[in-house]
Amino acid sequence: MDSLLGCGVSAAAREPVPRYLTSQPRVSEVAMQSAPLEQPAKRPRCDGSPRTPPSTPPATANLSADDDFQNTDLRTWEPEDVCSFLENRGFREKKVLDIFRDNKIAGSFLPFLDEDRLEDLGVSSLEERKKMIECIQQLSQSRIDLMKVFNDPIHGHIEFHPLLIRIIDTPQFQRLRYIKQLGGGYYVFPGASHNRFEHSLGVGYLAGCLVRALAEKQPELQISERDILCVQIAGLCHDLGHGPFSHMFDGRFIPRARPEKKWKHEQGSIEMFEHLVNSNELKLVMKNYGLVPEEDITFIKEQIMGPPITPVKDSLWPYKGRPATKSFLYEIVSNKRNGIDVDKWDYFARDCHHLGIQNNFDYKRFIKFARICEVEYKVKEDKTYIRKVKHICSREKEVGNLYDMFHTRNCLHRRAYQHKISNLIDIMITDAFLKADPYVEITGTAGKKFRISTAIDDMEAFTKLTDNIFLEVLHSTDPQLSEAQSILRNIECRNLYKYLGETQPKREKIRKEEYERLPQEVAKAKPEKAPDVELKAEDFIVDVINVDYGMEDKNPIDRVHFYCKSNSKQAVRINKEQVSQLLPEKFAEQLIRVYCKKKDGKSLDAAGKHFVQWCALRDFTKPQDGDIIAPLITPLKWNNKTSSCLQEVSKVKTCLKF
């Protein structure tokens, strides 16, 4: 049976099927859609009110009117709700109703029933079976009308539950249409025009694909429709907190504008999600679709951000939204354990598509072989106590493909995400925003004014902050913004800071606390025969980039568990040596790129020599790339340093301390 349900078939056919229903073919989509379809009205945007009003709570036992049954989401129906529906349609014979009760046929299984299956279950009357199938088909058709379809260039036609549509049709979510996925990368890769909006749709969809496949393969996990909805919502909303130009905002701008603020976009995402729910009054809508807001909002936020700082009292399980028996649900959207999650799957496929780069990872194959296994851990405080945790595992033969996945991630970082000019443009936009920050006003809650850097403190203000701020500053008539405008005009005219070259530390990596003083080091590393040009620290930009497999210097596969065909319940680990001798020895490295803000030939010649001298003093690798310094590399002897050179390093570091 195909385990990739939800990745190309109708939403009604994505539900787990009981064993007694798997021997016969499913009802075709054609049969399910045989009833005449009315042309649906256009879905409204941003007003928070979809065409179909939210249903009453999924417990339908108290419902009697036809319209009430038509408008409820049958995926939330329990067996008793199915019996209530059948009674309402005239099937009042206890024997027939008991068939549905005894076999625990929930609403999600109704689309898979046909005459043969009903006969196998014990519905003997042909007339009764035909009448029952007709009722179920009408019900299935109404459910299809509730779902909305998006034509996505990556995943094809993807369907979303009405609750997800309510979330999508809010100003807070629509804001993602105006935030570039790759920030300044669009100025280097002309195809990289995609935004956080479509990526978020893709992650929400893939989250549903994976969790439904697990629910079908392993019904004993008791994954409910409520769980599935929450996982999809987390996927949909995981990037709500991104600022202008995506990672540029929380990775470069905020650390420089507010160095005391340890803020990341994940924090912004959970705050924006709360604002989205409250300002659009979605808690009642969530209840109407079977969610429990008090628990499920916490669960959704935990999937995005990770466990709370303060764990649950007297418990080894750090989460509050779901118990430890459903620990695997936290590994779908943002996998803190090993980094294998649907967020990566979508941006691999989507970014490669728009960048014109080949994507070699097939997420559908991973879903095909994914299953949940229980892993035992010994608790450090008490070696005798063993904690059992359920993890998403893959077949042992897939280990090579997972190494390829992380290699793909590394390649994307090298070729696109950390492209030397993409990063440079992000740096220049950051410089412009820092110049503009004191003079830009954004109206927030109760009319309070915020700056670009303080909008993260108020979600109403942050909702208004998108990539559009670039054009607002560029075209402003405020003379106070002239410096910022000059930088932005230089970006548009391709008059960029000059790239000098790239190097790497041979031994210890540069620590974060050292980053700020690196330009001073370069400025002070003046060679003996340097041109008579004075260069200051502010003339240099030193960009330190850490490239890894997603877990700093650790091998992420060491934290992945596998199962074998002979025993699908036992989780095992696979060492790197068991896979291949050609796999990397190190899983992280540091790149150091240096740029110069001055652009005249004399200054650039001097800056190049400063950079080469600095690399020699710090015992970094010979600089590569930068045309300006290429002729200067050969004469220097990196491996035979004199004591005076080492003394110079000490002098430079000593000066910088004061």
UniProtKB/Swiss-Prot annotation:
The UniProt transmembrane annotation reads none
Instruction: Name where it's found.
Output: Nucleus; Chromosome
- HD domain ranges (all copies): 196-348
Ranges for region Disordered: 23-68
Q: Which residues carry this modification: Phosphoserine?
A: 49, 55, 64, 125
Swiss-Prot/TrEMBL catalytic activity: a 2'-deoxyribonucleoside 5'-triphosphate + H2O = a 2'-deoxyribonucleoside + triphosphate + H(+); dATP + H2O = 2'-deoxyadenosine + triphosphate + H(+); dCTP + H2O = 2'-deoxycytidine + triphosphate + H(+); dGTP + H2O = 2'-deoxyguanosine + triphosphate + H(+)
(Microbial infection) Phosphothreonine-modified residues are 634
Please state what class of enzyme this protein is. hydrolase
Pfam families, from UniProt?
HD (PF01966), SAM_2 (PF07647)
- State what induces this protein: By interferon alpha, beta and gamma (IFN-alpha, IFN-beta and IFN-gamma).
Chain positions recorded as GTP binding sites: 148-149, 169, 174, 177, 494, 498, 565
GO MF term list: deoxynucleoside triphosphate hydrolase activity; dGTP binding; dGTPase activity; GTP binding; identical protein binding; nucleic acid binding; RNA binding; single-stranded DNA binding
Which cofactors does this gene product need?
Answer: Zn(2+)
Enumerate the residues binding dGTP 2: 151, 188, 365, 395, 397, 401, 419-420, 565
Its quaternary organisation is:
Homodimer; in absence of GTP and dNTP. Homotetramer; in GTP- and dNTP-bound form. Interacts with MRE11; leading to stimulate the exonuclease activity of MRE11. Interacts with RBBP8/CtIP. Interacts with RBBP8/CtIP. Interacts (via its C-terminus) with CD81.
- Please report the name of this protein according to its UniProt entry: Deoxynucleoside triphosphate triphosphohydrolase SAMHD1
Taxonomic placement: Eukaryota, Metazoa, Chordata, Craniata, Vertebrata
